[in-house]
């Protein structure tokens, strides 16, 4: 990659990192460990490539929400048909509820743990394909203030946590997200 002038590589996560307190999500799979990420990060750094963590934080959380521990955080507890389902005829929760403070608490704890393994001061929080936003628990708030405002309020809560962590790390964190 370095010979092709790449200077940044984003490591995309959904449920493919071995989060310490969340084994139920990755059990039976082959998630990356902290040690593996640190080795990859050092390898990239030595080649002037910035390795940036990318953890979806609203949509694409179905691999979490199918488990009882996380299901209460879902936008639609009874689920929906979505294109990323392993079984297309089965309804399952897809996204976190943007108006549930527990959703913010979960994703910021994931970000905090993940960031410990990266040199980069950047974090891509995904936020794409929020196909169920406003169709479940956040529906009334979306009607009241608008779906866009609900989305931005959730994004800002996550970003504010990153800024608090910036102070702890001694450098300004840059929050990135997709623009769809």
Where are these regions (language model features)?
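Substrate-binding cleft/loops of secretory-pathway carbohydrate-active enzymes
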Residues: 169-180
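Substrate-binding cleft of carbohydrate-active enzyme catalytic domains
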Residues: 1-168
């Amino acid at each position: 990659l370095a010979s092709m002038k790449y200077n940044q590589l984003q490591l995309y996560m959904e449920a493919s990192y071995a989060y310490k307190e969340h084994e139920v999500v990755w059990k039976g799979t082959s998630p990356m460990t902290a040690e593996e990420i640190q080795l990859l990060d050092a390898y990239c750094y030595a080649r002037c490539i910035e390795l940036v963590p990318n953890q979806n934080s609203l949509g694409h959380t179905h691999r979490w929400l199918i488990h009882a521990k996380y299901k209460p955080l879902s936008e639609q507890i009874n689920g929906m048909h979505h294109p990323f389902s392993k079984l297309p005829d089965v309804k399952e929760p897809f996204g976190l509820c943007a108006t549930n403070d527990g959703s913010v608490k979960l994703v910021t704890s994931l970000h905090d743990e993940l960031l410990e393994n990266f040199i980069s001061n950047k974090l891509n929080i995904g936020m794409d394909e929020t196909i169920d936003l406003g169709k479940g628990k956040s529906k009334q708030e979306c009607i009241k203030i608008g779906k866009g405002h609900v989305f931005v309020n959730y994004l800002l809560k996550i970003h504010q946590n990153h800024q608090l962590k910036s102070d702890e790390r001694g450098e300004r964190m840059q929050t990135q997200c997709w623009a769809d």
